[in-house]
Amino acid sequence: MPNILNKILEQIVFWMAWIIIPLIMEIIPAFGGFVILLKKKLFGKKEEKPIKLPEITLIIPVYNSADTLEACLASVHDSTYPTEQINILLVNNQSKDDSFKVYCHCQELYPDLKMQWLSAKQGKSKALNMALFCSDGKYIIHIDSDGVLEKNALENMVIRFENDPDVHCMTGAVLTSKEMIEDTESFRGRIVRRCEFLEYCQAFLAGRNFQSELDSIYTLSGAFSAFRKSVILKTQLYNTDTVCEDTHVTFQIRKLMKKSVHLCENALFFVDPIESGEKLYTQ
């Protein structure tokens, strides 16, 4: 009889752990993030747009990005941020495809965009460090070459910086493309991609939003992040000996420089949805 009771107790503890841990780690922060978003929407202070938006540098690491680079640059060109105030540094990370040809084509398509092609040694952190030293302007923004900016993303992020001098570093909200999700032919594939979209929403619009309110963001999104130039250049920059360079630079800003890191929830960056359920599981 005691053995049976022990087994029943073990099963109760086991299943309670599977229920309680997700409740604490996922559901409560998600609900908190929703409340925070609602509060900002209804009662948030309206951010004032400066008379003239400052000059910024947009750093885009490029590695075999021939298929996605044109769409990425088109989203920058079509954004609401003044093109004359944007400096774009495309840092080639030893690509082996036609990325450079796409860059040359985009120079012809968008002659009003100031674009520069740099070549760096292998490794994303080395590419980012190289571009940081070549940057101009008040703010430095990183985006990946395999996604596209929502048209107001750059403007919203810079306005947040300009309205709050205590914000020194921000991460944008990364979501999967809803258009590509709805264009998915198979029903199963569409369901998988919608689940992935909800996962991204939970991670950024709920989880990161909750962390931002508590000032507890310790990892920037490598796909879309921004810094005050005066702050990032005082760090040890990106560590070339680790694959967690985004976390490393975030810790430098938070712990060594005692600066704050926030989420800009209305600065959106869209990436391609997952190709299959198997890849979603791996991710």
Residue positions per predicted region:
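Short, acidic, metal-binding catalytic loop of nucleotide-sugar glycosyltransferases
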Residues: 74-85
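Cell-envelope/extracellular polymer assembly enzymes that use nucleotide-activated donors
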Residues: 54-57, 87, 248
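Glycine-rich, basic loop-to-helix element that forms the pyrophosphate-binding segment
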Residues: 118-135, 156
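A conserved acidic beta->alpha catalytic loop
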Residues: 92-101, 120-122
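Short aromatic/hydrophobic "clamp" motif used to bind/position activated sugar donors
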Residues: 140
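N-terminal membrane-anchoring/stem segments of glycan-assembly enzymes
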Residues: 1-52, 208
